[in-house]
Amino acid sequence: MNKHFLLLFSLFYFIVEATSLKCVTCHLRTQSDHCRRGFGVCLAQKHEICMSLRIYFSGSLQLSYMVCQRFCKNLTYIFNNRTYTHKCCNSDFCNFRL
């Protein structure tokens, strides 16, 4: 009985793992397209999706930030002559392409 339970549990774990949303993480990506901090992949938890924040100055990308995020809203606003663009998506690695 315990062997069957362990086998079922293992299969369930791999199915859940295979279906988890994967997002790129980068806590500081520069305009030269290099991630300076926190590069990797996060597995979105319950109610999380992929998020990208990009900061522009005079129309030129200055830096970006990418993570798995629970509360995410597509939003663009201007503050101190910089444009902040939040984008949310829900397919694997989609925040890298935004």
UniProtKB/Swiss-Prot annotation:
Cleavable signal peptide: 1-20
Any Gene Ontology CC annotation: extracellular region
Cystine connections: 23-50, 26-35, 42-68, 72-88
UniProt entry keywords in alphabetical sequence: Disulfide bond, Secreted, Signal
Entry keyword annotation includes Hydrolase: no
Record InterPro entries: Ly-6/neurotoxin-like_GPI-ap (IPR051110), LY6_UPA_recep-like (IPR016054), Snake_toxin-like_sf (IPR045860)
Domain UPAR/Ly6: 21-97
Main localization category: secreted
Family statement drawn from the similarity comment of this UniProt entry: Belongs to the PATE family.
Protein name: Prostate and testis expressed protein 3
Lineage: Eukaryota, Metazoa, Chordata, Craniata, Vertebrata
